[in-house]
Structure formats: C-alpha cells, structure tokens
C-alpha cells in the first residue's frame, strides 16, 4: 500500500470539490482529489446540472422551431425522440470533463479515481478500480461527495419503467405519458423538458403550491404556464405505493386516486453521499438524509475535517456548492477568501426559467417592511418581442422610503442571467443600493437588462 502525504485531501470532484481544491492549490498547498468516477466533474457534470440543462437547451430549440410560423415555409413541425435529443445534449459532458481535468493539471492537483473512505481523522484510503489501495495522509480533509436521489425502500427502482433523476438519462424511448412524483426544482425542470417534447405530464406535488419558497406571483405564473402546456399538477397528494407493469406504471395515492402512465420519474428529495465514507471511523454523525452538519466555517465537529456542497444540505445548488468549497478551503489556508455563502440567487431552469434573489413579498409583509413593487412585463420589451419570448416579467421589491432594493424576482427568457444585475446592486454598501441606479444608468438597447429601468419607473410611479 503506497502512502502519500498532503496538506489537503478533497473527496469529490463536483463544484464544491473543485472550488475547494483550486483555492487550496492556488494558496500553495499540496492537494489531492479523490473521486469515485474515472472522470472529474461529479454528479453535476455527468448526471445532473450539465446534461439536464443541455437537454433543456435542445428541447427549447425544438420548441422554437415548431412554434415559429416562419419555419413552416420549410416544413411541418418536427418531433424528436428523447434518446435523440439526449444524444445531442450529452456532447457537452466530454467538453466539461476536458476543461476541468485541465484545471487540476495546471494547478498540480493529484487525482485519485476510486472509492475513498476514512481510516481515521487524517487518513483516507482509496480503493482504485484495479483493486490497488492508496493511503492518503492529510492535515485537512474536505468532504464534497455530493448527493444522489432519495430512494424509498418500498419502490422498485430496478423496474424498467421506474426512474429517478439520475437514471432518467438512460431512458431509451419517448413516453406518451409520464408521471413525475415530486414538484421541487428537479421535478419542475423535467416536467418542462418532457412537455416540450410533446409528452403528457402528471406532476404530483405533496404541497399546495409549486415551489412555495418563491415569490407567490412567480409561482402562480409557473402554474399557469404548466397548465397551458400539457402538464397536469396535482397538489396535496402523497404516494401510497407504486405498481410497475409490463407496459407502464400505476401510482396509487393516499387520497385513493390512481394514475397510470408509460413511466414514472421519482424526484422527491436527495440523500448525501456519506454511507461509504466510513464516517464511524472519525466520529462525524450524519442525519437521516445522509447529510453532515458544519459550522459557518464549513468545519465539522472534527476540527480538521470540513464539508461543502450538497452533502451539507441547503441550498443544494451547483453555484453555491462551488463557493462553499472555496470558502471551506479559505478557512484552512486563511487567505481572505472565506465567506459564509448565504446570498445565493435561485436559478430554476424550467421553460421559461425562473430566478430570484433577496426577500419576497410574503417575507417583507411578515417583517412589516414598508416596500413597494416595480414590474416590467416581457411582452412589452423590444428584445423579448424580437426573440419571440413574450412570456414573463421582472419584479423588483424596494423600500418605499430609502429606495433600497430588497428583492428581485424574474420569470421568463434569460431570467437566470437577468437576476445578476439586481444582485450586484443589492450587494452595494449603504445608499449605493438604490432603485435610482436603474433610472440613472444607460442600458444597451434592445436588451433584456432594460427591464430593470422599466420596472424601476413602474415602482417609482407607485410612490406618493
């Protein structure tokens, strides 16, 4: 057994692991990266964020072709199978792997591909694919192993018609009807994707509102859009059992209802990847969902062991995970890069997409903050009209007296890009965070960013 010594060992090469490894390496530390796959990138690159967003992009292109009258001159609407669309989308994975492999090489981070587990608080043993065991001894270890879909024991996920958000990418046909159980972010995103391919979708939600953490107006807009696009949303429903058939699946609900479809996609929660880490050897406990607890420095109860990304729970976003990993390493190397990551914009890649940052109306009302609202509807924006994307709006919440921007909520074309302008202003100190910025700034024309000026004028016109 070979023994290697490092300053920092990172478990997991997803966004959190990458952020941690790069920060530690750039601070001059000797760093090793361990990943259970034979390629870097983690679940984000291989099964999650990257393939699903690339898939969404391909579906949007198909939808634009099929709904734009201009293209009828060259033929009728085209329908593509799910495997064909996925094959096109998967091309980006190899490009991402190549880019990320280059990052590690340039920063002299040693890569170990195999199953890593704790032997003790400073030692990780890696069982490689060829059976060779490597021992890595480190001053500090960062757990960034991510998460996987939660699988209830009473559901047969080996059945060929039952999928989760990892295995759905192996779907070999296009179902006519699909049940999606779980209307969280992942469930809503896949509902949009399959609906865009002409699939009838039954979206089962165990709550009374879609994505209830969003501003209620944005949530309602998504619900309305779903209802117009072959997506039936069933609220306040819980599964009783799932019955797999030769030609489909029947979902039995506790309300007594039964839904039959060609396939079922389970999107109800995620579990931290900690069960194979030998956590009992270091005294770090995990909760019922396999997640570990950390402090604001991303340190566990063991002083030299840290955690970042999905494995620590909220907010379980790739963007936040990268910054959490970077901050965990910042706590170790003490180079001024640490920050507690809590100002994360929400990006939801439904069709149309959603993004927000800051407070929503419910939160401000509950806190008795005197706020006002400014809105810009995309149907009136020149750039949205040119792009043929009239659905959506930008909504700015601001303080009536100080004009401080308190929240930005966007639904529609390029929402995940648009939100960053508001985020930048909200992060300005003191009086520099003001709605007046949008009125006194010249925006390129025509752009979607111009919606900020329109919304600002709308909000100011409401004041008296």
Swiss-Prot record:
It comes from the Bacteria. It is found in: Cytoplasm. Its cofactor is FAD. It is an enzyme of class 1 (oxidoreductase). Belongs to the class-I pyridine nucleotide-disulfide oxidoreductase family. One of its GO terms (biological process) is NADP metabolic process. Binds 1 FAD per subunit. This is Soluble pyridine nucleotide transhydrogenase. It catalyses: NAD(+) + NADPH = NADH + NADP(+). Its EC number is 1.6.1.1. NCBIfam families: PRK05249.1. GO terms for molecular function: dihydrolipoyl dehydrogenase (NADH) activity; flavin adenine dinucleotide binding; NAD(P)+ transhydrogenase (Si-specific) activity. It holds the Pfam family Pyr_redox_2. GO terms for cellular component: cytosol. It comes from Pseudomonas fluorescens. Conversion of NADPH, generated by peripheral catabolic pathways, to NADH, which can enter the respiratory chain for energy generation. HAMAP family: SthA. InterPro entries: Class-I_Pyr_Nuc-Dis_Oxidored, FAD/NAD-bd_sf, FAD/NAD-binding_dom, FAD/NAD-linked_Rdtase_dimer_sf, Pyr_nuc-diS_OxRdtase, Pyr_nucl-diS_OxRdtase_dimer, STH_gammaproteobact.
